[in-house]
């Protein structure tokens, strides 16, 4: 039907007869000559309908309104002098229409295609209209290119694409499962997979050696900008490998996917140990586009003349006193503004926030009176203070201090007066050497998941046991991660016991895995990359909803289809379900 897409045409096509198809983006009648901006997936081009060129086409054009579906035939010509539109890729040319067909009419649309000021609820209700915006098409073109690149590079490296079940057993991995009632097995339920984790391990036991899948996953959890109840991950597993082997494949995969989207990234990526990330950046997903590294000053504060600080400093195994130097902040923020930073960190458990300012005549601030001249000089030297700098201090329980000082670091870096993060940079970092366990409310939990291989279980403090686990972080966002897995039944049973999962519960939930590990499971490991998050970052969107064709809202509902919805009583009866 068509010979070209709109933006395929240029001055090189002058004089050619072409056939275009798309939607009427806008309509203008200028003294008898009608101009129509035709839009297709590639962009816009101007159609000119002059009664002197084609009376029939002009007559048809006079009845056209926004979003009518058109097919136009005509010749490409240069626009007249002074009539070009530099904002359009095709702004130097137009199509002189000889034949025009209205393939379909449109009701009045609820918003102009491409309008960025439309509320999200309206956009999602009419998502199919929003998708007509060529910029939306470009986002999904990149997504398609990245998926193809992922498949190609993994295929080249000997990986086999295998689909794992969507209807599976409920084995909660931290979030709640989406449950599917069985009609055949009354009172029993399937679960939608939170990940293909156990199935891909079983594929390794089955000798498949190298597996991948672009997998749909489901988690019934509270949503935010970078989460959806259903999401896509690029899932990879390999046998007879170590951590280095897995990370090498992950880097090859990311280089290929970014390259397909026109972005060059260079491996190998930086690495940082989990505990260093927490001590320096207050986060296990640090944004390294800017420095702002926290420094430990607990030894200096232990000698100060302030009982609050000295009491905190007496317990360095459980407490921290951290300093965050912000270059030039004294030249940017007033004292009143710096006081608002204290209000910010109080939201996250801080009891207060101290600060010093580096002036021409030395270090100044309300806390300076508590320190000796020697310790003031030591602070200046250790922190590398220069005139105009401000240093902020956080003190208290180490996890609380890490959290609020890490958040303060991001808050300051992203402040409109600082803008420390390069919006065009892609700064990758591997976070490695994660603790195997964490203790929360007296309960032992797996920091990643219970199938992760520990480095050494012979430690007095369970929180000191490290795992062979690794996360890949990009610009402060966790893209994904993985681990070397437990491949021996005895070790897996021991880890379950440490997590408080008894023998009977382990057999009920994971008996199939434990059975498989009895039959010569190979050493194996893998990773998964959040595809939606990855595309959100590549295409510089603020939410993964912008890179999913038909996303859910933050309430996990679909405004377009009105899902979830009530179902027929007959369906409930067949599923043996009664509603209260």
Curated annotation (Swiss-Prot):
Report if keyword ATP-binding is assigned: yes
Q: State the top-level EC class.
A: ligase
Listed A to Z, the keywords are:
Aminoacyl-tRNA synthetase, ATP-binding, Cytoplasm, Ligase, Nucleotide-binding, Protein biosynthesis
* Catalysed reactions, semicolon-separated: tRNA(Asx) + L-aspartate + ATP = L-aspartyl-tRNA(Asx) + AMP + diphosphate
Q: Which PROSITE patterns match?
A: AA_TRNA_LIGASE_II
Gene3D superfamilies listed in its UniProt record = Bira Bifunctional Protein, Domain 2, GAD-like domain, Nucleic acid-binding proteins
Kindly list the GO CC terms recorded for this protein.
Answer: cytoplasm
Q: Which cysteines are joined by disulfide bonds?
A: none
Where is this gene product found? Cytoplasm
Locate the residues binding L-aspartate. Answer: 173, 219, 448, 485
Known EC number(s)? 6.1.1.23
- Report the sequence similarity comment from the record: Belongs to the class-II aminoacyl-tRNA synthetase family. Type 1 subfamily.
Subunit composition?
Homodimer.
Q: What function is annotated for this protein?
A: Aspartyl-tRNA synthetase with relaxed tRNA specificity since it is able to aspartylate not only its cognate tRNA(Asp) but also tRNA(Asn). Reaction proceeds in two steps: L-aspartate is first activated by ATP to form Asp-AMP and then transferred to the acceptor end of tRNA(Asp/Asn).
Q: What is this protein called?
A: Aspartate--tRNA(Asp/Asn) ligase
Which lineage ranks, top first, belong to the organism behind this chain? Answer: Bacteria, Pseudomonadati, Campylobacterota, Epsilonproteobacteria, Campylobacterales
């Amino acid at each position: 039907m068509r010979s070209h897409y709109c933006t395929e045409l240029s001055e090189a096509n002058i004089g050619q007869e072409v056939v275009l198809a798309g939607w009427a983006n806008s309509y203008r009648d200028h003294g008898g000559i009608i101009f129509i901006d035709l839009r297709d997936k590639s962009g816009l081009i101007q159609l000119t309908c002059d009664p002197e060129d084609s009376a029939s086409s002009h007559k048809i054009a006079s009845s056209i309104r926004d979003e009518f579906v058109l097919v136009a035939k005509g010749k490409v010509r240069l626009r007249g002098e002074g009539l070009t539109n530099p904002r359009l890729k095709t702004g130097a040319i137009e199509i002189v229409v000889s034949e025009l067909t209205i393939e379909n009419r449109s009701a009045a649309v609820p918003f102009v295609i491409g309008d960025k000021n439309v509320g999200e609820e309206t956009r999602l209700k009419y998502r199919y209209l929003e998708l007509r915006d060529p910029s939306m098409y470009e986002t999904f073109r990149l997504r398609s290119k990245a998926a193809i690149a992922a498949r190609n590079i993994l295929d080249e490296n000997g990986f086999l694409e295998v689909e794992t079940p969507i209807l599976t057993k409920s084995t909660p991995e931290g979030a709640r499962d989406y449950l599917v009632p069985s009609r055949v097995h009354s009172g029993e339920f399937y679960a939608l997979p939170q990940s293909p984790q156990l199935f891909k391990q079983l594929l390794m036991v089955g000798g498949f050696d190298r597996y991948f899948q672009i997998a749909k996953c489901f988690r019934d959890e509270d949503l935010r900008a970078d989460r959806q109840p259903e999401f896509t991950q690029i899932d990879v597993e390999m046998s007879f490998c170590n951590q280095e082997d897995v990370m090498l494949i992950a880097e090859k995969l990311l280089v290929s996917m970014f390259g397909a989207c026109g972005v060059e990234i260079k491996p190998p990526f930086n690495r940082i140990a989990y505990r260093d990330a927490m001590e320096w950046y207050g986060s296990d997903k640090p944004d390294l586009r800017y420095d702002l590294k926290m420094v430990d000053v607990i030894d200096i504060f232990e000698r100060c003349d302030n009982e609050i600080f000295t009491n905190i400093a007496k317990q360095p195994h459980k407490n921290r006193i951290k300093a965050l130097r912000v270059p030039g902040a004294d030249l940017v923020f007033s004292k009143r503004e710096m006081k608002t930073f204290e209000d910010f960190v109080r939201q996250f458990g801080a009891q207060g926030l101290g600060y010093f300012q580096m002036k021409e005549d030395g270090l100044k601030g309300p806390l300076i009176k508590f320190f000796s001249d020697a310790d003031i000089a030591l602070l200046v030297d250790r922190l590398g203070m220069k005139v105009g700098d401000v240093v902020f201090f956080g003190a208290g329980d180490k996890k609380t201090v890490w959290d609020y000082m890490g958040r303060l670091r991001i808050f300051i870096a992203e402040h409109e007066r600082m803008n420390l993060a390069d919006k065009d940079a892609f700064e990758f970092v591997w976070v490695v050497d994660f603790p195997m366990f964490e203790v929360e409310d007296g309960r032992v939990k797996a920091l990643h998941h219970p199938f992760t291989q520990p480095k050494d279980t012979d430690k007095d403090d369970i929180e000191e046991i490290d795992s062979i686990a690794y996360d890949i972080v990009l610009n402060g966002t966790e893209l994904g991660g993985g681990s070397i897995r437990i491949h021996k039944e005895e070790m897996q049973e021991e880890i379950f016991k440490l997590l408080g999962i008894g023998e009977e519960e382990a057999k009920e939930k994971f008996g199939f895995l434990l059975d498989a590990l009895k039959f010569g499971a190979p050493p194996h490991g893998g990773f998964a990359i959040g595809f939606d998050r990855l595309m959100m970052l590549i295409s510089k969107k603020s939410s993964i909803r912008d890179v999913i064709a038909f996303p859910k809202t933050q309430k996990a509902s679909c405004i377009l289809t009105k899902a979830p919805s009530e179902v027929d009583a007959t369906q409930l009866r067949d599923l043996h379900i009664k509603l209260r």
